[in-house]
A protein has these predicted regions:
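An acidic-aromatic
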Residues: 1-39
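Solvent-exposed coil/turn segments that connect beta secondary-structure elements
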Residues: 4-5, 11, 42, 76, ...
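Short, cationic low-complexity segments
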Residues: 180-185
Length: 185
Protein backbone atom coordinates (compact mmCIF):
# COMPACT_ATOMS: atom_id res chain seq x y z
CA UNK A 1 0.00 0.00 0.00
CA UNK A 2 1.39 3.36 -1.01
CA UNK A 3 -0.09 6.85 -1.05
CA UNK A 4 -1.20 6.38 -4.67
CA UNK A 5 -2.05 2.66 -5.00
CA UNK A 6 -2.83 -0.67 -3.39
CA UNK A 7 -0.94 -3.80 -4.43
CA UNK A 8 -1.03 -7.29 -3.06
CA UNK A 9 -0.01 -10.75 -4.15
CA UNK A 10 -1.75 -13.99 -3.19
CA UNK A 11 1.08 -16.46 -3.75
CA UNK A 12 -1.01 -19.43 -2.65
CA UNK A 13 -3.67 -18.92 -5.34
CA UNK A 14 -1.22 -17.27 -7.77
CA UNK A 15 -3.22 -14.06 -8.09
CA UNK A 16 -2.43 -10.37 -7.70
CA UNK A 17 -4.25 -7.06 -7.35
CA UNK A 18 -2.96 -3.63 -8.38
CA UNK A 19 -5.14 -0.51 -8.43
CA UNK A 20 -5.22 3.13 -7.48
CA UNK A 21 -7.78 4.40 -4.98
CA UNK A 22 -10.16 5.50 -7.76
CA UNK A 23 -10.78 1.79 -8.42
CA UNK A 24 -13.10 1.61 -5.40
CA UNK A 25 -15.11 4.61 -6.60
CA UNK A 26 -15.32 3.32 -10.17
CA UNK A 27 -16.29 -0.19 -9.10
CA UNK A 28 -18.33 0.34 -5.90
CA UNK A 29 -19.09 4.09 -5.80
CA UNK A 30 -17.11 4.38 -2.56
CA UNK A 31 -14.41 6.99 -2.13
CA UNK A 32 -11.41 5.60 -0.31
CA UNK A 33 -8.10 7.32 0.36
CA UNK A 34 -4.71 6.22 1.62
CA UNK A 35 -5.41 7.91 4.97
CA UNK A 36 -8.66 5.98 5.34
CA UNK A 37 -7.09 2.60 4.52
CA UNK A 38 -4.20 3.41 6.86
CA UNK A 39 -6.65 4.14 9.71
CA UNK A 40 -8.52 0.91 9.04
CA UNK A 41 -5.39 -1.24 8.99
CA UNK A 42 -3.76 0.46 11.99
CA UNK A 43 -6.92 0.13 14.11
CA UNK A 44 -7.37 3.88 14.53
CA UNK A 45 -10.84 5.40 14.92
CA UNK A 46 -12.34 6.09 11.51
CA UNK A 47 -15.69 6.98 10.08
CA UNK A 48 -16.79 5.64 6.69
CA UNK A 49 -18.34 8.99 5.77
CA UNK A 50 -15.06 10.80 6.51
CA UNK A 51 -13.28 8.20 4.38
CA UNK A 52 -15.70 8.97 1.57
CA UNK A 53 -14.72 12.63 1.80
CA UNK A 54 -18.18 13.75 2.88
CA UNK A 55 -16.90 15.09 6.20
CA UNK A 56 -20.33 15.86 7.64
CA UNK A 57 -20.51 16.45 11.35
CA UNK A 58 -22.71 13.78 12.84
CA UNK A 59 -24.17 12.86 16.16
CA UNK A 60 -23.50 9.43 17.56
CA UNK A 61 -25.68 7.53 19.95
CA UNK A 62 -23.62 5.92 22.74
CA UNK A 63 -24.62 2.63 24.35
CA UNK A 64 -22.70 0.54 26.87
CA UNK A 65 -22.94 -3.15 26.00
CA UNK A 66 -21.39 -6.22 27.58
CA UNK A 67 -18.73 -6.13 24.83
CA UNK A 68 -17.83 -2.45 25.22
CA UNK A 69 -19.08 0.94 24.08
CA UNK A 70 -21.12 1.12 20.90
CA UNK A 71 -21.33 4.31 18.87
CA UNK A 72 -24.03 4.33 16.21
CA UNK A 73 -25.45 6.77 13.72
CA UNK A 74 -28.11 6.59 11.03
CA UNK A 75 -28.11 9.01 8.16
CA UNK A 76 -29.79 9.54 4.86
CA UNK A 77 -27.33 9.59 1.99
CA UNK A 78 -28.00 10.72 -1.56
CA UNK A 79 -27.55 7.96 -4.11
CA UNK A 80 -25.20 8.53 -7.02
CA UNK A 81 -26.05 7.68 -10.62
CA UNK A 82 -24.09 4.41 -10.48
CA UNK A 83 -26.01 3.14 -7.48
CA UNK A 84 -29.32 4.35 -9.00
CA UNK A 85 -28.63 2.08 -12.00
CA UNK A 86 -28.15 -0.82 -9.58
CA UNK A 87 -31.50 -0.11 -7.91
CA UNK A 88 -33.28 0.28 -11.27
CA UNK A 89 -32.10 -3.22 -12.21
CA UNK A 90 -33.86 -4.38 -9.06
CA UNK A 91 -36.97 -2.43 -10.16
CA UNK A 92 -36.64 0.14 -7.39
CA UNK A 93 -36.60 3.91 -7.81
CA UNK A 94 -34.63 5.49 -4.98
CA UNK A 95 -32.89 8.82 -4.50
CA UNK A 96 -31.66 8.23 -0.95
CA UNK A 97 -30.54 5.32 1.17
CA UNK A 98 -30.46 4.95 4.93
CA UNK A 99 -27.03 4.03 6.23
CA UNK A 100 -26.39 2.69 9.73
CA UNK A 101 -22.85 2.80 11.04
CA UNK A 102 -21.85 1.05 14.26
CA UNK A 103 -18.50 1.25 15.99
CA UNK A 104 -17.80 -1.06 18.93
CA UNK A 105 -15.05 0.32 21.19
CA UNK A 106 -13.07 -1.96 23.50
CA UNK A 107 -13.44 -0.61 27.09
CA UNK A 108 -9.88 -1.64 28.03
CA UNK A 109 -7.91 -0.25 25.07
CA UNK A 110 -10.44 2.35 23.81
CA UNK A 111 -9.84 1.16 20.27
CA UNK A 112 -12.37 -0.09 17.70
CA UNK A 113 -12.97 -3.86 17.76
CA UNK A 114 -15.72 -3.80 15.13
CA UNK A 115 -16.89 -1.23 12.61
CA UNK A 116 -19.89 -1.93 10.40
CA UNK A 117 -21.95 -0.08 7.83
CA UNK A 118 -25.34 -1.34 6.65
CA UNK A 119 -27.82 -0.17 4.05
CA UNK A 120 -31.04 -0.40 6.05
CA UNK A 121 -33.30 -0.74 2.99
CA UNK A 122 -31.26 -3.38 1.19
CA UNK A 123 -29.44 -6.48 2.33
CA UNK A 124 -25.95 -4.94 2.00
CA UNK A 125 -23.24 -4.45 4.61
CA UNK A 126 -19.53 -4.13 5.15
CA UNK A 127 -17.70 -4.70 8.41
CA UNK A 128 -14.19 -4.70 9.82
CA UNK A 129 -13.47 -6.87 12.88
CA UNK A 130 -10.30 -6.57 14.95
CA UNK A 131 -9.27 -9.45 17.17
CA UNK A 132 -6.58 -11.12 19.24
CA UNK A 133 -4.86 -7.96 20.49
CA UNK A 134 -1.23 -8.45 21.46
CA UNK A 135 1.98 -6.50 21.93
CA UNK A 136 3.98 -5.61 18.82
CA UNK A 137 7.02 -3.39 19.51
CA UNK A 138 5.49 -2.47 22.89
CA UNK A 139 2.26 -1.30 21.21
CA UNK A 140 -1.07 -3.04 21.57
CA UNK A 141 -2.29 -4.05 18.12
CA UNK A 142 -4.78 -6.56 16.67
CA UNK A 143 -3.15 -9.74 15.47
CA UNK A 144 -6.06 -10.35 13.10
CA UNK A 145 -8.33 -8.11 10.99
CA UNK A 146 -11.34 -9.57 9.15
CA UNK A 147 -13.14 -7.63 6.42
CA UNK A 148 -16.62 -8.86 5.49
CA UNK A 149 -18.78 -7.71 2.59
CA UNK A 150 -22.34 -8.98 2.13
CA UNK A 151 -24.75 -8.26 -0.70
CA UNK A 152 -27.81 -10.46 -0.36
CA UNK A 153 -26.64 -14.07 -0.20
CA UNK A 154 -23.23 -13.20 -1.66
CA UNK A 155 -20.68 -12.92 1.11
CA UNK A 156 -16.98 -12.23 0.79
CA UNK A 157 -14.37 -12.00 3.49
CA UNK A 158 -10.70 -11.19 3.72
CA UNK A 159 -8.64 -12.06 6.78
CA UNK A 160 -5.31 -10.41 7.57
CA UNK A 161 -3.02 -11.97 10.17
CA UNK A 162 0.00 -10.12 11.46
CA UNK A 163 3.00 -12.15 12.57
CA UNK A 164 5.45 -9.30 12.97
CA UNK A 165 4.94 -5.54 12.91
CA UNK A 166 7.59 -2.83 13.02
CA UNK A 167 6.50 0.76 13.55
CA UNK A 168 8.08 3.97 12.20
CA UNK A 169 10.45 2.16 9.85
CA UNK A 170 11.13 3.47 6.33
CA UNK A 171 9.75 0.93 3.92
CA UNK A 172 9.91 0.38 0.21
CA UNK A 173 7.76 -2.25 -1.49
CA UNK A 174 10.01 -4.68 -3.30
CA UNK A 175 7.95 -7.59 -4.54
CA UNK A 176 7.71 -8.89 -8.08
CA UNK A 177 4.63 -10.32 -9.70
CA UNK A 178 5.16 -13.49 -11.69
CA UNK A 179 3.81 -13.36 -15.26
CA UNK A 180 2.04 -16.66 -14.46
CA UNK A 181 -0.17 -15.00 -11.84
CA UNK A 182 -3.72 -13.90 -12.73
CA UNK A 183 -4.90 -10.37 -12.08
CA UNK A 184 -7.82 -9.95 -9.65
CA UNK A 185 -10.38 -7.60 -11.20
Amino acid sequence: MTKDSIKFVDTYHKKFFVADYDYFYDKFDVRVSFDCVEKIITNAFFDFQDCAGLGKEKKYKLDKTELGYELSTVEERAISRKIKKFYKKKRKNKDFMLVLQRILIDPEYFRPVKVSVEDLDEDMSVSVNYGAFKQFSEKNFPEKIVFQLAVGNNKTSLELKFLKIDFDVPLEPNFKISPKFKRIE
